Amino acid sequence: MGVLDHVSEMFDCSHGHKIKKRKQLQTVEIKVKMDCEGCERKVRRSVEGMKGVSSVTLEPKAHKVTVVGYVDPNKVVARMSHRTGKKVELWPYVPYDVVAHPYAAGVYDKKAPSGYVRRVDDPGVSQLARASSTEVRYTTAFSDENPAACVVM
């Protein structure tokens, strides 16, 4: 079959055509400020007409929109921003339980909804929040629970 494969490669006409990738089913979470029912309606209608959108869920108190479907997140954000004229961004928060140190300087956000903290992809921020091994040794050396602790007092 080596000869047939070689001949079929020579006369293959599909090299000029791109094969379309099928989009994956995604859940896109978006932050957009919604003050009234009119804003909610405008946000919902801006996304519902998109090709590939299965469902749209609004949480106006948290300023959160969840879009489920076969869509590109960047296209959803661009369309919503263009159609509504509002500032739109991907959901920048993660649940409080996921973060190791939720009150670190780069993570804690006063404007975040309750139960959420800001998502930080920078590994340097998490390193600043954790204590080094020498700091841990110093704090445990003077602990009341440590029987071998310093008893100067």
Swiss-Prot record:
Chief location category: nucleus
Protein name from the UniProt record: Heavy metal-associated isoprenylated plant protein 26
Residue list for modification Cysteine methyl ester: 150
Lineage per the UniProt record: Eukaryota, Viridiplantae, Streptophyta, Embryophyta, Tracheophyta
Record propeptide residues: 151-153
PANTHER family: COPPER TRANSPORT PROTEIN ATOX1-RELATED (PTHR22814), HEAVY METAL-ASSOCIATED ISOPRENYLATED PLANT PROTEIN 26 (PTHR22814:SF302)
Gene name of this polypeptide: HIPP26
Source organism of this protein record: Arabidopsis thaliana
Single Gene Ontology BP annotation: heat acclimation
GO CC annotation terms, alphabetical: nuclear membrane; plasma membrane; plasmodesma
